Amino acid sequence: MPVVTRLMSFLGDRWQEEQRDAALFHEFDCPGPVQAGRVSRCSCPCPAQILDRVATDRRIVRDCEQRIRREQDRGLCWSVESVRAFQVMKAFALPYELHPGWQESWRP
């Protein structure tokens, strides 16, 4: 299913950008060093919240993709559960609709 693969790739790229940019949101008095896009252990709430949200979003969308692939492997093509899972995936892409890589077919 190329449409699922393209959407997963698009979301993965956006989340990778967010993970990289999370390091920009440390508080001014943060003693922790920032190393190559990774957030060190510190008490700044914003980077940790961004990284936690991205990890949760990845997990949910990965579960949706696995459901679609599993049903496709069993010969079910776009069952109700697959359609619902794909709608969830498209909802996660909606905040990025202004990105040049956005495809209108991803609108929920």
Identify what each model region corresponds to.
Residues 26, 30-33, 42-44, 79, ...:
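Functionally engaged cysteine thiol sites
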Residues 1-35, 54, 58:
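Aromatic-glycine hotspot motif
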Residues 17-24, 45-80:
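Amphipathic alpha-helical oligomerization segments
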Residues 2-10, 41-62, 85-108:
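Flexible loop/turn and low-complexity linker elements, especially glycine-anchored beta turns
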